[in-house]
Amino acid sequence: MPTPIRTILLDIEGTVGSISFVKNVLFPLAKQQYAEYVHKHMDDASVRVFGNSLDEIVDKLNTLHDSGSKDQAFKALQGSIWKDAYENGKVVAHLFPDVVPLLKRAADKGVRVCIYSSGSVPAQKLYFHYSEYGDLSNYISEYYDTSIGPKVEADSYKRIVGSDDPATWLFLSDNVHELDAARQSGLKVGLAVRPGNEPVSSSGYSEYGSFDSLL
C-alpha cells in the first residue's frame, strides 16, 4: 500500500494564489512605498542595513526589487509594507477557489498543511490571515521561508521534514527545480499547473490543475 499523506507542504505564488496577484499587485505596491517607508523608518536597524542615506537605501531596495532578490532582510521589509496594506484594507490575498476546500478536507482528515515560500514568514501569515476567503490561519500548521534554506536545495526539505518520514509529505509547487530538490529528500511532489503559470513541458511529475482530487 502507498504511504498515506500526513502533511501537505504548499508553495504560495503560482500554487495556492495567482502569480499575477503577486507580480501585478503586491510587488508594485511595495515598490511604490519604498521611499515613504524608508523616510518613516530611517532609524530602524531593519532599514539601516541597506545603507546610510535615504537615497542610498531606496536605490538599494529598487535594485533588489528589480533583480527579484530573495534576500531575507529585503523580503522582511517588503512584508512590513504589505502588512500596512493588508491591515488598511488596500489589498486582500488571492487564492484559487479549490484551496479552501482542500484546507478543510485536510483538517477533517487530520492532515497537516504547511507553507514554504520565498516570502518571509510574517508575509506568509498575512497572506492567509487577509485572504479573499477570510482568515484561514487556523488551517496552517507551520510556515517556512528561506531562513531554513533555499527552495532549490534538498537539504532545506530535510530540515523541514526533520524526523518525520518524508514519504508522508506531499510538496506542491509550480517550480520544477523546487520539486527536484524535494524529491531528492524523499518527499512526494506534484506540479501546480495554474492560470498564468509558465508552461512546463515533460516535467515527469504529477500535474495538478486543480486540488479537488487531493485527499
From Swiss-Prot:
Its EC number is 3.1.3.77. InterPro entries: Enolase-ppase_E1 (IPR023943), ENOPH1_eukaryotes (IPR027511), HAD-like_sf (IPR036412), HAD-SF_hydro_IA (IPR006439), HAD_sf (IPR023214). Its main location: cytoplasm. Substrate binds at S117, S118, K151. Pathway: Amino-acid biosynthesis; L-methionine biosynthesis via salvage pathway; L-methionine from S-methyl-5-thio-alpha-D-ribose 1-phosphate: step 3/6; Amino-acid biosynthesis; L-methionine biosynthesis via salvage pathway; L-methionine from S-methyl-5-thio-alpha-D-ribose 1-phosphate: step 4/6. It is found in: Cytoplasm; Nucleus. Keywords: Amino-acid biosynthesis, Cytoplasm, Hydrolase, Magnesium, Metal-binding, Methionine biosynthesis, Nucleus. It catalyses: 5-methylsulfanyl-2,3-dioxopentyl phosphate + H2O = 1,2-dihydroxy-5-(methylsulfanyl)pent-1-en-3-one + phosphate. GO terms for biological process: L-methionine salvage from methylthioadenosine. It holds the Pfam family Hydrolase. GO terms for molecular function: acireductone synthase activity; magnesium ion binding. The keyword Cell membrane does not apply. Its cofactor is Mg(2+). Mg(2+) binds at D11, E13, D174. Binds 1 Mg(2+) ion per subunit. Monomer. PANTHER family: ENOLASE-PHOSPHATASE E1. Belongs to the HAD-like hydrolase superfamily. MasA/MtnC family. Bifunctional enzyme that catalyzes the enolization of 2,3-diketo-5-methylthiopentyl-1-phosphate (DK-MTP-1-P) into the intermediate 2-hydroxy-3-keto-5-methylthiopentenyl-1-phosphate (HK-MTPenyl-1-P), which is then dephosphorylated to form the acireductone 1,2-dihydroxy-3-keto-5-methylthiopentene (DHK-MTPene). This is Enolase-phosphatase E1.
